[in-house]
A protein has these predicted regions:
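A conserved beta-strand-to-alpha-helix junction within the catalytic ATP-binding
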Residues: 1-13, 29
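Short conserved segments within the C-terminal catalytic ATPase subdomain
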Residues: 15-30
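Conserved micro-motifs of the catalytic ATP-binding
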Residues: 34-41
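Short helix-loop "hinge" at the ATP-lid/N-box region of the Bergerat-fold HATPase_c
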Residues: 57-58
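Short conserved segment of the HATPase_c
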Residues: 89-101
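Conserved glycine-rich
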Residues: 129-130
């Protein structure tokens, strides 16, 4: 899973550079290279999950903001966390964002179909995982956690 995350992040870094957007993608994975973060999954579908989550975080971010991507483990799961510094969620909306065509997007952040996070949720569930959204504690922004069963 780590390799997939790093590849998708690198693609997004290049896209941001090409678009002259100054949004920093931070991974806390360098000190974890020796870890074996293995899951059973369909690689291109997991890439799609990560890409959809990063695309969403980037679309809510402004220049000079950071998006953090981390990977940790529990006894049974790998936990991927993506945190942004955007506006976060209204109190009633964190889990609604995974519904088809739902948008929590203020008009200043542009139009989206409302399908990306629903697709991500469906793919995660196909892999016997779970996905959850929340506001960051004591900070501005949103946090998405993806749990996937490890081997």
């Amino acid at each position: 899973l780590m390799k997939i995350i790093l590849n998708v992040v690198e693609d997004f870094r290049q896209d941001l550079k090409n678009q002259n957007k100054n949004i920093e993608l931070l991974t806390n994975l360098d000190n974890k290279k020796e870890k074996n973060f293995f899951i059973v999954g369909i690689e291109n579908r997991l890439e799609q999950v990560i890409a959809n989550l990063l695309d969403n975080a980037i679309s809510f971010s402004e220049n000079n903001q950071k998006i953090e991507i981390d990977l940790t483990e529990t006894s049974n799961n790998l936990v991927m966390t993506i945190k942004d510094q955007g506006p976060g969620f209204t109190e009633s909306s964190p889990q609604k964002i995974f519904k088809r065509f739902y948008s929590n997007r203020p008009s200043s952040f542009g139009e989206h179909s409302g399908l990306g996070l629903n697709i991500a949720k469906n793919i995660v569930e196909l892999h016997k995982g779970a996905i959850a959204a929340s506001n960051r504690l004591n900070q501005r922004g949103a946090q998405i956690e993806v749990l996937l069963p490890k081997i």
